[in-house]
Each structure stands twice: as C-alpha cells, then as structure tokens.
C-alpha cells in the first residue's frame, strides 16, 4: 500500500534534515545571534534560535533564503521581528510553523515545495 503524506508525517522535516546531516560533512561554527549553526552541505544550513540582528549576517554568508520552522508560540520566536529584518536585508523569508509533537502533513508539503523552488537555495533553516 503506498504511503500518503499523512502516513509520512512521523518522518518529520527534522528527520529529513538529520538524514541529510548524516550523509554530509557538517561544518559547525559560532555565529553571533545564531544558536547551534551547522552548515550541512552547500545548499543547506541549520540552526536553532536566531535573533533578528543575525539576519543580515545570514545574507552576507551567501544564503538565498531563510526558512523558519518555529512555532510563533515558542519562547523568543519573534516572527514579526525576523520578517521585518529579512525584508530590510532583502532576503526572502518563509515562516512554515512545524510542530514535532503533532506534525502537520500540510506543513511538510509546504516545506518541500518551498525548499525545492527556484532561487530558494542555499537555504538557512531554523
């Protein structure tokens, strides 16, 4: 029986990123305003929380876009601040709220469509 997107929901976006990390050489570095920065490969970097002030640095590092998977309810998420900072820096910013506790197949679909769209990579995902 073929799997549907709903059947794949337990295999979260985070799981996909871990699989990429396992197959690539992960480069970690300290970047002010970015927690746990790791460049997974030439087209993707992942991190934990960031500050709006780090967005200009993300653009300077050569990323074409920022994909934020955090829920607006998370402490320090500051979606509005990130959106404004990305607009000021001239870097596309995508907010795709994703809960690992209750994965939403629609969010997974949106992420996959976004990350594979022309001009999105290299992407900074957090």
Go through each PLM region and give its residues.
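Bacterial N-terminal signal peptides that target proteins for export
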Residues: 1-12
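Cys-dependent protein tyrosine phosphatase-like superfamily
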Residues: 16, 20-123
């Amino acid at each position: 029986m073929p799997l549907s997107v709903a059947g794949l929901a337990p295999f979260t976006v985070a799981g996909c990123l871990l699989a990429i990390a396992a197959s690539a050489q992960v480069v970690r570095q300290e970047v002010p305003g970015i927690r746990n920065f790791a460049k997974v490969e030439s087209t993707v970097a992942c991190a934990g929380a960031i500050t709006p002030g780090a967005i200009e640095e993300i653009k300077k590092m050569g990323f074409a876009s920022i994909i934020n998977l955090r829920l607006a309810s998370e402490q320090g998420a500051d979606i509005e601040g990130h959106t404004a900072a990305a607009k000021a820096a001239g870097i596309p910013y995508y907010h795709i709220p994703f809960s690992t506790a209750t994965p939403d197949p629609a969010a997974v679909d949106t992420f996959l469509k976004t990350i594979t769209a022309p001009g999105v990579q290299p992407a900074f995902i957090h």
